[in-house]
Amino acid sequence: MITRTVVSGLTVEFSASFFNVPSIAEVQRALYDATKLVSGRPGEEVKQRLRTGTVVTTDDRNWELRYSASALRFNLSRAVAIDMESATIAAQGYRFRVPYGTLLCVSDKPLHGEIKLPGQANRFYEGAISEHLQIGIRAIDLLRAEGDRLHSRKLRTFNEPPFR
C-alpha cells in the first residue's frame, strides 16, 4: 500500500515498508535518569549526548543505496534514527500496544557521509557496550520501581482491539 501526501508543494509517497515508531515518555525519562546515574555525567552533558525520540523502522535493507528517494520521507518523520532489527520489535510492540524499549548502541552516522571503518567501530564498541548494557538494566530497574504508576496513552489494555 502506498499513500501520497503533499507537503509544501512536494508529493511524498509512504509505503508499507516504513513505519514510524514513536517514543514513550516514561522510557525516555528512565533512560535519561539511568544514563546520568551510570555515566556519572552532569545532566547538561547527558542531554547533549543522549538521543531519544521517534525511530523509523524499515524492511528495506538497501535504503541507503537510494538515499535521495528516502531522505525527504525520513526528514518529514522527524526521526532520530533509522533501524531495522530492534525497531521491528518496537514496531510490533507499538502496533499491539505492548510495552517495549530499545537501547541502541550507535557507532556511525550513515546519513552524514562518514566512512564505516572496522577499527573505529571496534574501538567504540569495546568502550560502549558495557556502559550501554548497564544503562539499559538501570532503566528497567527504574521503570520496575514505578510499577502501577506507569501509564502511557500509547499503550492499550490486553482486551482492547489492536486496530480501530
Q: Which role fits each region the language model picked out?
A:
Residues 1-164:
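Glycine-rich phosphate- or other oxyanion-binding loops that anchor nucleotides, phosphorylated ligands
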